[in-house]
């Protein structure tokens, strides 16, 4: 049985967005599930769009997500694998060899036309109300190709192509999709249309998974496969990732972010991987969250949907919160090192882990950590609006609020052994003494001791703050309530 070999071939032209990550994830899952090989290839022939540092960001982002590759370039500048080079700019000689085969067969020709002449052809086709096809304007006696002009493919046969896509099913396109496209540009570098076909064959790629936008170009690719007399790999097109509105492809204007932005916001790679997999794929059950191991075991191309998958950032954040809750404390602590607020810098590890244990269930992203924990490390800024805008507390007069806080302070002061359990018993007693509902009394105590909208369980929060600090903050609140 032929070993499955898949690839991800990004261009170093900018940041890695979620669409690119999913384009890497699906072939990686297919390779890992079948004990195959996953190849990373850098398609860097478009030098006009090259961005310094973008290639290094590709390595960094894939590694962060947990996608490893068996062959290709590495971050240390070396390559692994026997089918290199894995940068297209270093494979010019290979492309020229394949181009010569087409020239010798009469299936490629030098393009002698200037941009102005091509525009005139376009205008002529438009005047005739016809689609512009370059093959209708082929030069009758093209010059010998010397490498300074573009080299064009001469479509050998104008026919309808039909192919089987494991995701989209049977697809076909007629002659209108076929044209004489450029193989080698005037700068000597190949176009994507030519290079990826040569590379996939040379690197023995068995399955190509790419976006649905490539469906329209597939007949051109198939005509080139025929001309080169090579068998195409399995060609699969995954659905578009749609904007939150669901009516167009996701773009920057729809709030699309780079993978690096999500990483800096505290999205876990496990959550991102599970979320990306769900954008167009499911296992046929109600399960929503998958570990890497589960995805490798369950991923199937025939479970990828044909229609576009709507991007829902709220769902990603929800999913991230679920993964955070499932981490053990030590693992979560290690991941939080870059996310603590500056007020936590001087705190010791034991105390920070105690704080993190309380905050864990409320964290949706690691970036939430400072807002949820700052009052454990420094004195919070008094914000009386938290009381004034609280639906329950604004029913009380300021004197009633102060009285409740004073009674609470007096009762809590009676606790000798300051533990969560004893504090909870005291809070229950306070409910009886004051004849108040928890939503009123506990909210008032929580705000007075943390000046935050949310906090962990009140008794646990007070226990970790300590008796002196808790009582001091209650007294300060009493003095500041007008």
How would you describe each model-predicted region?
Residues 85-89, 184-185, 203-214, 242-275, ...:
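Conserved phosphate-binding loops in nucleotide/dinucleotide-binding enzymes
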Residues 16, 262-270, 306-312, 346-355, ...:
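Structural motif
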Residues 329-434:
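Small-residue-rich helix-loop
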Residues 32-44, 194-207, 228-242, 456-459, ...:
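Glycine-rich phosphate/pyrophosphate-binding loops
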Residues 101, 109-237, 243-250, 258, ...:
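Active-site cores that bind ATP or allylic diphosphates and position pyrophosphate for catalysis
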Residues 27, 58, 102, 106, ...:
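Residue-level signal for inorganic ion chemistry
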Residues 421-481:
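Charged substrate- and nucleic-acid-binding regions of tRNA-handling and nucleotidyl-transfer enzymes
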Residues 1-127, 218-230:
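N-terminal Rossmann-like or analogous alpha/beta NTP/dinucleotide-binding catalytic cores
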